[in-house]
Amino acid sequence: MQLTKWGKNKMPNWTFNTLKVVAYSDDEGAIKQFDEFVKLSIVPAKVYDEEGKVKGESKEDKAFTFEGVHPMPKDLMITSGTRTPEEEKQAQENLKKYGHKDWYDWSIAEWGTKWNASNFCILEEILDDKYSKELTVSFDTAWCPPMEWLQKATEKFPLIRFEMEVSEESDAFMGKPIAQYGKVCENITDINYPS
């Protein structure tokens, strides 16, 4: 799915995502990968002060993050658009080192969406029975589902199964991408309404 199809410089329409992660109990390697995925992806939520700056982490609340599977390099945390001479120098160094000048270009190329997951909710706590371990979460993304992130997740954790359900807020597309063994079946349908 190409982000530019919906216009990368406009305010985003939101995509609603539900992700189910499954490891079957008879596969010890899959169970280890599942536990590692959960450890990296479900993290303490950040706590912000009145000015919107991070002041710490919550002891109770959790967040789902793309950073656990595919972290953004800290050097990329500069703005696109107008830059100081120092930021422009950093942008050129970033381009050489990472292939992207800033967080915006990197996150679109590497995660498939402008920002990290937002409005996270655990829909089903880790279900651990004699057949499988499962975790189901919902989250929102800007413009598109995080297909590039999903590809990286299945490459890093090939033995676990990722099942997503996605829909765009104006119903421009929907689908049920599935990933396992390093491959993603997108299964996204564009719905073209007459203008």
What are these regions (language model features)?
Residues 3:
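Cationic, low-complexity basic patches in intrinsically disordered or flexible, solvent-exposed regions
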Residues 6, 10-195:
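Long, contiguous binding/interaction regions
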